[in-house]
């Protein structure tokens, strides 16, 4: 019956219907209905997302989806953001660009995260894709402003250039001048990560001649005195990153900035504010009533000035801020911003032992009580209680992402000195739609039992300095049906939990473990047992076979793949496929023979 229904629609109709299906997992499900749907979906797929660049080869993707216009790739594991992945590990995008340059000549969008991108890559992109429109490089490295100059000079239809949090070699600040004088298509520009000055005259000319520019995020080197000039050239902006927000207090600078901002009637998102001078903050008040996003994570502004600013932002939906906001500021946020969906509070002094601000669990409790739409939290603090976590869970059962980072590892409930198991247990029990969870504080295996029992929709879990034994990890792997990414550091989890749940790993995207109790022997056995997994031992102490098999490895990264072992492994990475484990065995036999 299903086959007859599938065949009753012309291909053109099905292609049109499929175009409304946006989620990759839904597109994948559609392609499994029957052979004809598989072929139609294959030829009409325009966007591809690959969460691990080593999970599949470029050739396989190109063969599977010949008409792709947009590619999104991720490289290094998430823990690379915390310097836990050694330099030179991999994540090189050049093989992908090289393969796509000859097969996807009409490619329009490339979005990369945590990948190594060289100037050669950027030059090849500029040369190969004639209708190229979007380049997003998020937390990438390896390229310079010379590569950006090639993009600017050649990609005449470029709409978006986003370098968010990338490490760029600033060879020259004049790369913006490579955009041709006839170029007018820019919609979004993010250069906030650049350390050096850019040519302001080139930037001003670019902004002036792009009437559709909606998002402009400047770097710290753009002085506050010149911001008003750019705003006057682009009053249509919807998103602004201010760059440096410091200057000698002068009435003419303040009034010029205030007038320019008041002319930006469409502005909805503000960020930047490096080294913000409080005296200039009231200049933004005229746009605050419309703001939905405010990123103050670089603004070292004290609570008093933050409170005055937040009182002007009743429509705020997303706030990123340093812990200078303190509990008092979060109470004002809770009473003012009833539409708040996302809150991130970052530490101003993460390596200072004594607290430098009055930020506690009470601030988060206040927001959970006052903001009924809150669904995403990242909260750095120095103390927490089970009672507070239980209250937050009951107040906000709609939470989908909850990441709590208590700065001191293994910190207990500071009032009772008990583990925080019950508190996090309440989070996973009450928040039925929880997708992402990060744990911290003193935690036993009990919390992982709660997670395995209740967190049925959780897709990503981050764990550090937690648990008692393999049982904790076993609870998670055996109980969390939707788990896709698990990252663990400094926990006593080892061989038993890993090997007992080997089949679960084939349903996940990846597992990262560092400074745990996983042995080299278990990694070898897992690699032999599960050929669809790449089991990569990362050990900078030397070849793991030079030590007893019972010796724990420094790091292991396990991920599902249809491409087999990768070919760009550095000298400190070993793949535990069957061939490599046989080579290790022969080496051990030879060594013992000597």
UniProtKB/Swiss-Prot annotation:
Protein source organism: Arabidopsis thaliana (Mouse-ear cress)
Copy the domain comment: The F-box is necessary for the interaction with SKP1.
* Cell compartments where the protein resides: Nucleus
Tissue expression remark = Expressed in roots, stems, leaves and flowers. In adult plants, mostly expressed in floral stigma, anther filaments, abscission zones and vascular tissues.
Give a single Pfam family match. F-box_5
Q: What induces it?
A: Repressed by miR393a (microRNA) in response to flg-22 (flagellin-derived peptide 22).
Q: Which residues bind 1D-myo-inositol hexakisphosphate?
A: 74, 113-114, 344, 401-403, 436, 484-485, 509
Please state what is observed when this gene is inactivated: Plant are deficient in a variety of auxin-regulated growth processes including lateral root formation, and hypocotyl and cell elongation.
Functional pathway: Protein modification; protein ubiquitination
**Which residue numbers mark the site Interaction with auxin-responsive proteins?**
139, 165, 380, 489
Q: Which GO terms describe its biological process?
A: auxin-activated signaling pathway; cellular response to phosphate starvation; defense response; ethylene-activated signaling pathway; lateral root formation; pollen maturation; protein ubiquitination; response to auxin
Q: Miscellaneous notes for this chain?
A: The myo-inositol hexakisphosphate acts as a structural cofactor.
What this protein is called in its record is Protein TRANSPORT INHIBITOR RESPONSE 1
Q: Which domain of life is it from?
A: Eukaryota
Function according to Swiss-Prot or TrEMBL: Auxin receptor that mediates Aux/IAA proteins proteasomal degradation and auxin-regulated transcription. The SCF(TIR1) E3 ubiquitin ligase complex is involved in auxin-mediated signaling pathway that regulate root and hypocotyl growth, lateral root formation, cell elongation, and gravitropism. Appears to allow pericycle cells to overcome G2 arrest prior to lateral root development. Plays a role in ethylene signaling in roots. Confers sensitivity to the virulent bacterial pathogen P.syringae.
